[in-house]
Amino acid sequence: MRFRVDGVLYNQNRFSDFLEDHYNAVSTRLKIMCNANISERRLPQDGAIPFDVEKGIDLRVNFLPTHGGSERVVMRILNKKGLSVKLEQLGLDEKNGLDKLLSAVNAPQGMVLITGPTGSGKTTTLYSLLSTINKEGINILTAEDPVEYALEGIGQVQVRDDIGFGFGSALRAFLRQDPEVILIGEIRDKDTVEIAVKAALTGHLVFSTLHTNDSPSSITRLIDMGIPPYLVSSAVSLVMAQRLARKNCSHCSKVQEGVTVEQLVDLGFSTEEASAVKPQKGKGCGKC
């Protein structure tokens, strides 16, 4: 068993002996708790477990068949309290373009894209953006895979590729539902991006995500998917790339020697900022 904390995997050896003897039983029990098929061990399965109703914590569970007949189980912790996080609490400020983001979010139409690797907090940012504009008189629809959090006052739709109801099909239906705002969980194919661009150009505010390393790459990706450059420039209002940066422990971090100004500039600091910054590194302690 391993836990991923702040992007780093840690072994939990105290469970090793128990899981070695009872792994299949634990896997079956988890399937029962999340209403998965306990007899299916050939195909991947997904499920959800309400973990702590009072605190609003749920578990998203994925079962993956592996060689030898066993299954790999991954559980993701979802905290509904994260929905109430304000944009300022996500580390966004005027220096990081918060004013530009708010301007794009409050526009009557256009496309706002959030990019970054898996697990970089794109969904949390999108939900925070929706919370910012979720007011009476605004019709908001979302197409997600899966629907991770229930949002009050927002129409959320679970896409089902297995029955032919993908993001593209959901978007076509949305355009007949008279929405002001549309959220697409992810732009994956040409069909989806074509409808999303059409929506952004016809009086709708569209939010979505892309898996690219930086903001400029998102424009290239849209063009590679078949959208003419003149439509991209007309439809896209803003692209924001984000990462989750680990914080140093305030109890054990110390100034890290040997970091040059050139290295800090390569990380995105200006020359003036790099000259004033004193990089620190945590050593690890009981507090962290």
Role assignments for model-derived ranges:
Residues 2-4, 48-50, 58-62, 74-76, ...:
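Structured core elements
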Residues 16-23, 91-94, 120-123, 189-190, ...:
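Conserved phosphate/pyrophosphate-binding and hydrolysis machinery centered on Walker-type P-loop NTPases
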Residues 7-8, 155-157, 266:
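Short glycine/proline- and charge-enriched loop/turn segments
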Residues 102-112, 123-246:
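Switch/coupling sub-region of P-loop NTPases
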Residues 7-9, 19-20, 55-56, 64-68, ...:
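Conserved nucleotide-binding/hydrolysis micro-motifs of P-loop NTPases
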Residues 212-288:
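Cys/His-rich Zn2+-binding cysteine-cluster or related metal-binding knuckle/ribbon modules and their
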